[in-house]
């Protein structure tokens, strides 16, 4: 996984890739982040490339210190930092979207309860339209980040041979529609993968 209790820093690790309150705990987010990582990033990247991303997370450049344009950083460090940032952005947004209801409720032996502040402060419930807009925004940001991730890896395939040898890449390479860009060339969809990968309901 590319989030951890060790690097959580009172939610600052998550806040670096999306707008959240710094009081958010790793304990609350660990399962949603792990689920989204396994459900979306692992199938997209393949096991070898996921291993590379996790290694970059654990031992590579610190994105809080290393910006992509930092002088003195090697080209590979800049690429690794960018790759990790895109992966984390996709992972975080998809975790909130995928587990939206579970995150906003408590499940106990007494049943299901709405989350309330532990320190006694009161928070007004969001309106239904705000909740719907938030869900759509999280979904779009997450899937757009996955598109950005694929474009990044296609552009830097020589630097990341783990992705080039993955079954996921081989399947996409032989597909009729390989990417959002292929669809965008024929019919403008504004780069939204949700349009060309959505399943009929």
Regions found by a protein language model. Give the residues of each.
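Low-complexity intrinsically disordered segments
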Residues: 1-24, 148-194
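N-terminal interaction modules that seed assembly of large macromolecular complexes
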Residues: 11-72
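Structured alpha-helical bundle/scaffold domains in large eukaryotic membrane-trafficking regulators
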Residues: 48, 52, 103, 107-115
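Short, mixed-charge amphipathic alpha-helical segments
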Residues: 59-63, 71-89
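Elongated alpha-helical scaffolds
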Residues: 82-109
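Conserved binding-pocket/active-site segment within a compact domain
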Residues: 108-169
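Residue-level detector of conserved catalytic or cofactor/ligand-binding positions
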Residues: 193-201
């Amino acid at each position: 996984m590319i989030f951890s209790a060790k690097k959580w820093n009172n939610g600052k690790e998550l806040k670096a890739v999306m707008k959240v309150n710094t009081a958010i705990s790793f304990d609350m987010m660990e399962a949603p982040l792990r689920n989204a990582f396994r459900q979306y990033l692992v199938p997209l990247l393949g096991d070898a490339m996921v291993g590379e991303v996790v290694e970059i997370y654990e031992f590579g450049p610190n994105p809080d210190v290393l910006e992509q344009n930092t002088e003195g950083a090697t080209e590979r460090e800049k690429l690794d930092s960018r790759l990790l940032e895109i992966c984390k952005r996709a992972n975080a947004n998809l975790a909130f979207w995928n587990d939206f209801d579970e995150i906003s409720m408590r499940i106990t032996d007494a049943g299901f309860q709405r989350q309330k502040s532990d320190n006694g402060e009161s928070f007004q419930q969001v309106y239904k339209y705000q909740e719907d807009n938030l869900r759509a925004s999280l979904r779009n940001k997450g899937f757009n980040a996955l598109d950005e991730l694929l474009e990044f890896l296609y552009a830097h395939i020589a630097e990341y041979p783990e992705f080039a040898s993955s079954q996921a890449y081989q399947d996409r390479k032989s597909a009729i529609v390989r990417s959002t860009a292929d669809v965008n060339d024929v019919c403008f969809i504004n780069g939204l993968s949700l349009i060309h990968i959505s399943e009929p309901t």
